[in-house]
Amino acid sequence: MTDYKATLNLPDTAFPMKAGLPQREPQILQRWDSIGLYGKLREIGKDRPKFVLHDGPPYANGSIHIGHAVNKILKDMIIRSKTLAGFDAPYVPGWDCHGLPIEHKVEVTHGKNLSSDQTRELCRAYASEQIEGQKAEFIRLGVLGDWANPYKTMNFANEAGEIRALAEMVKGGFVFKGLKPVNWCFDCGSALAEAEVEYQDKKSATIDVAFPVADEAKLAGAFGLAKLAKPAAIVIWTTTPWTIPANQALNVHPEFNYALVDTGERLLVLAEELVESCLARYNLEGSVIATAPGSALELINFRHPFYDRLSPVYLAEYVELGAGTGVVHSAPAYGEDDFVTCKRYGMVNDDILNPVQSNGVYATSLEFFGGQFIWKANPAIVDKLSEVGALLHTETISHSYMHCWRHKTPLIYRATAQWFVGMDKQPAAGDTLRQRALQAIEDTQFVPAWGQARLHSMIANRPDWCISRQRNWGVPIPFFLNKESGDLHPRTVELMEEVAQRVEQEGIEAWFKMDAAELLGDEAAQYDKISDTLDVWFDSGTTHWHVLRGSHPMGHESGPRADLYLEGSDQHRGWFHSSLLTGCAIDNHAPYRELLTHGFTVDENGRKMSKSLGNVIAPQKVNDTLGADIMRLWVSATDYSGEMAVSDQILQRSADAYRRIRNTARFLLSNLSGFNPATDLLPAEDMLALDRWAVDRTLLLQRELELHYGEYRFWNVYSKVHNFCVQELGGFYLDIIKDRQYTTGANSKARRSAQTALYHISEALVRWIAPILAFTADELWEYLPGERNESVMLNTWYEGLTELPADFELGREYWEGVMAVKVAVNKELEVQRAAKAVGGNLQAEVTLFAEDGLAADLAKLSNELRFVLITSTASLAPFAQAPADAVATEVPGLKLKVVKSAFPKCARCWHCREDVGVHPEHPEICGRCVDNISGAGEVRHYA
C-alpha cells in the first residue's frame, strides 16, 4: 500500500498544545521587561489621543487577595483594549501608604513606647517593604504599567502636594474647625472616616425610661387640661444606656400625635400610635385621656432621672415610629442628629456635656459612674434607673451596629474638636460643596448606571467631612492657631506653601520637627502649632491633584481629570466619594469623567470569602497551578456589575474554555505552515466564496468586539470570541476547509485562499484576546507568519479584514442558510452513526429533498456542496420526491436521507468515490487526488 502522507499538506506548528502557563508566563514577563514594553508603548503613543485611567491606590499592607486581582485585571483589560483602539493609555499604579493599619502593625512589632519620630520612620520602611511584595504580585498577573515609577502617597512630592491641595480648600473657604460628633474608636484613639466603619451584629440593652415633668402647668395646657391629676413623665426608648448620663434634651416629631396616658400611678406621654405596644411592653393597663401634636410640647421641661438638671423638649423630624416610644432622648455629644437639633435651639459648645474620654472611660468627675468603661457601665446605669423608679422596661436585642474596620470593636459617636470640610458652608465664591458635588454627579457617566443614584444619595445626605486624625503616621494639617482666639493664622495659605516646600525635600517629618519660630518668628509665642494629621481618605482623595497634576502629570485641557476611575462598589463611600469632594472644592468638577464599579468576590454559593469556610481563592495559588491567563479569562467572563462568583470548579471551567480558544489558535497556526503573507496573500476578489465570508464574518465580529471593549462589557467579548472559536470556526468553517487545506496543491489557489483567510482571522483573533489573555496573545504573536514587531500590544485592531460587497452572490444570508442545512445534516449523521449505519461522515451519502428556492441556493455550490457538508456525495432532489423514510428537518422546505456509500474509500482524502482505483498508477486513490498529485490540480470556486 502506497503511503500518500508526503503528498498531503499536513498541519505543522511549534506552538505548543499544552499551555504550561505557570512556567511560561514568568518567561513572557521577563521578555516584556527586557524589551522595555511599557516604555515602547509610551513612545508609540506620543501623538495619539490620551486615555487616562487613574489608579485607586490599594493599601500598602499584606499580600494581595482575589479582590485586588479582579480590580487590577479589569484595569489592565481596559488599558490594553484602549491601546489597541489607538489611544495613548498610560497606567501609573499607586499605593496608599499612611494611616492607622500600618501604624498598628508597627506598634505590634516594635511596641507602643516608640517616639513619634521612630513611629513614622518604621511606618515608612514597613510601607516600602509591603509595596515591593504587592508590586511583584500585581506584575505576575500580567498588568502593564509604570512599575518602576509608581505613585505612593508617602512620596515626598505627594505629601507636599496633599498639603497644597488642602491649602486650596482653605483658600476656597471650605475648611473649618468645629465640635461635632464623629465616628470614634477607643482602640484607635481617633476619629474614623465613614469608609472605615463596618456594621456587625451587636447585643445591646434597650431601656424605656421615664423623665418626670418639671413644667406641670405647661404640660397640662399642651393637652388642653386645666391641671394634671397625678404625677406625669415622658418616656424615651434607647439602645445606648451609657448615653443617659449625657442627656440634655428630649426630641419629639412636630407632626406626630402624642397621648397622655393614665396608667394608674402616673401619667405617661407616648406617641399615640405606639401606646398599645408600649403598655404591653411595660405590663401596664391604661387609658388615653388627651392627645396633642408634638409641636405643642416644644420647650416643656422634664427632669433628668438621676441628675439635678432639666431636659427640654425640642422638635426634630428625624424621630420615627418604627420602634420605641416616639420620643428620642438627646445626648448632643454622642449623636449627630442630637447635636444638630441642640445647636439649632441655641446650645453653645461649652454647654455640651461630654463625659466620655477618648479611651471610652467616663471622666472621674461624673457622678455615680466616673472611671467606668462605658460598655461595662451599662448595667450600673440600668440599675440606677431602676433604683430611682425611672425604668419601665429593659431587654437585650441583637442589632446591626457600627464597628471599627481594623479592631472589629464597637464605635460610638463622640463630639470632639476636629477639622472639617463643610458640605453646606458658603465658600469664598460659588456654590456650596454639596451643590457642586451633586451637579458633578449629574455630569459623570456611571458603569453600571445604578452607581449614580447611590453616590447621589450618599452626597445628598452626608454630614460635614471630618478630615483630622490624632495619629503619628499621616500627612500633617500644618495650621497655627492663635492661643487666645483659636483662629487660624491670617497667612495660613502662604505658610502652608512654605511647609509644602520643606515637606517636598524632607517628607512629613519636616513639619513635626519644625519649630514654630522657624516660620512665624516673633509671632510664634502667640500661636499653637497643631499636631493633627489628615484622614487617609484625604490622601487618596487628592491624588488627582498631586499625582495627575504633579508627580505624574496626565492633565487634560480642563486640568487634572481622569477619563475613568475603576474600583469596587464600596468606593462609592470611599475613594470615589473623597475624590469627588476634593475635586469639586478645588476645581469645581469631578476629577473623573466616568466611574466604573465592580462587585465583590463570593464563592459559588454566594458566600463571602472566609478562611473559616475554607472557600478563599488565593490569586498566588491560581498563578502557580493554572496560570494568570485563566484568572484573567474568569474575570472577563464574569459580569462584574454584581457579585463575582469564583471557586476551584469555576476556575476549572475557565481553564476548559481557555483550552478551546488555545486549540483554535493552534489549528490556525498549524494550517499557516508554509504561508508567507508577503508572497502568498491573495486579494479578496481572488479568494473562494467561503473564505471571503469567513473574513467578512471576522470583520463584523471585530466591530462588535470593539464596541463591547469600549463599553467595558468584557463578558460579551469573552462569550463572542469563545462562540466564534467553537461554533463558526470549529463547528463550521475550519471543518470544511480541512479537505482543501490538506489535499489540494501546496501552492494552489484553493489552499492559498483558505490560508489567506486563516491569516486574517489569526491577525484579528490575536488582538481580540490580547486584553484578556495577555500572556497567550503574545505567545501566539511570536508564531504568526510574516514580519512583525515585538508584541501584539504595539499594534492596533487589525485593519486587513475586508467586507463582502452588498451584491455578492453568496453573501451573509446565503451562508447562514447553508449553515442551517449543515446543522440539519450533522444531526442526522449523528443519528446514523449512533445506529452504526455509517462510520465517519465521509462514509455517508446524503440526498437533500428541497423546495425550489432552497434547492436553487444549494445548487449554486454545484459539486462543492459535498465539501461543505463533509460527506462523500451530496445530491439534490425535489422536495415532492422525498420518500417516506426521508427525515424532516427544522429547515423549512428540507427533508434529507443519509445512506452508507457503496463506493471504496480513497486512501488519501478518505472520501468514498466511484473513481477510486480507476488510475492504474494509483489504484488506492480517487481521481481528484490523482489530479492534485500529478495533474493540474482540482479547481475550487466556492468551498
From Swiss-Prot:
Protein name in UniProt: Isoleucine--tRNA ligase
Enzyme Commission identifier(s): 6.1.1.5
Major localization class: cytoplasm
Residue sites binding ATP per the record: K611
Gene name tied to this protein: ileS
Subunit: Monomer.
Chain positions of motif 'KMSKS' region: 608-612
Cofactor: Zn(2+)
Compartments (UniProt record): Cytoplasm
Record PANTHER family: ISOLEUCINE--TRNA LIGASE, MITOCHONDRIAL, SOLEUCYL-TRNA SYNTHETASE
GO biological process: isoleucyl-tRNA aminoacylation
Record bears the keyword Protein biosynthesis: yes
GO CC terms, sorted: cytosol
Pfam family, one: zf-FPG_IleRS
Reaction(s) the record says it catalyses: tRNA(Ile) + L-isoleucine + ATP = L-isoleucyl-tRNA(Ile) + AMP + diphosphate
MF terms in GO: aminoacyl-tRNA deacylase activity; ATP binding; isoleucine-tRNA ligase activity; tRNA binding; zinc ion binding
Motif ('HIGH' region): 58-68
Listed InterPro entries: aa-tRNA-synth_I_CS (IPR001412), aa-tRNA-synth_Ia (IPR002300), Anticodon_Ile_BEm (IPR033708), Ile-tRNA-ligase (IPR002301), Ile-tRNA-ligase_type1 (IPR023585), Ile-tRNA_ligase (IPR050081), M/V/L/I-tRNA-synth_anticd-bd (IPR013155), Rossmann-like_a/b/a_fold (IPR014729)
SUPFAM superfamilies: Anticodon-binding domain of a subclass of class I aminoacyl-tRNA synthetases, Nucleotidylyl transferase, ValRS/IleRS/LeuRS editing domain
Co-factor remark: Binds 1 zinc ion per subunit.
Domain notes: IleRS has two distinct active sites: one for aminoacylation and one for editing. The misactivated valine is translocated from the active site to the editing site, which sterically excludes the correctly activated isoleucine. The single editing site contains two valyl binding pockets, one specific for each substrate (Val-AMP or Val-tRNA(Ile)).
The family this protein is said to belong to: Belongs to the class-I aminoacyl-tRNA synthetase family. IleS type 1 subfamily.
UniProt: L-isoleucyl-5'-AMP binding residues: E567
Described purpose of this protein according to its UniProt entry: Catalyzes the attachment of isoleucine to tRNA(Ile). As IleRS can inadvertently accommodate and process structurally similar amino acids such as valine, to avoid such errors it has two additional distinct tRNA(Ile)-dependent editing activities. One activity is designated as 'pretransfer' editing and involves the hydrolysis of activated Val-AMP. The other activity is designated 'posttransfer' editing and involves deacylation of mischarged Val-tRNA(Ile).
PROSITE patterns: AA_TRNA_LIGASE_I
Binding locations of Zn(2+): C906, C909, C926, C929
